């Protein structure tokens, strides 16, 4: 996984918020991404040099996304499971991403 310090800071902020959702969350790192699981994977995070790609295990139509940040990737090849993608490249993206992650976690 290639990333810089700022990308790792974004990941660590997100990871801490995700883990605070509940004590039933398991982290499973793979070669290509990091999976966060409850009963099943609800989000996968792919590290890129200057951003994170989050794959949410929900259809984009099921998510409340007032900022239109979610991209439907159900017909596009990608790492991780999940049909909805959101990009996190700046700390200001974290609250929006986390609100979407929370929605998927609560449904899992």
Give residue spans per PLM region.
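Surface segments flanking catalytic/ligand-binding clefts of nucleic-acid enzymes
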Residues: 13-28
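Charged, terminal alpha-helix-loop-beta segments
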Residues: 2, 19, 42
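Well-ordered alpha/beta subsegment
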Residues: 76-108
């Amino acid at each position: 996984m290639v990333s810089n310090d700022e990308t790792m800071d974004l990941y660590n902020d997100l990871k801490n918020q995700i883990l605070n959702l509940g004590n039933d969350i398991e982290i499973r790192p793979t070669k290509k991404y990091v999976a966060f699981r409850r009963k099943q994977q609800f989000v996968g995070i792919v590290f890129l040099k200057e951003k994170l790609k989050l794959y949410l295990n929900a259809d984009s139509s099921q998510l409340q996304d007032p900022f239109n940040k979610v991209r439907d990737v159900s017909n596009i090849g990608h790492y991780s499971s999940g049909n909805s993608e959101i990009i996190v490249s700046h700390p200001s993206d974290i609250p929006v991403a986390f609100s979407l992650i929370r929605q998927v976690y609560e449904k899992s």
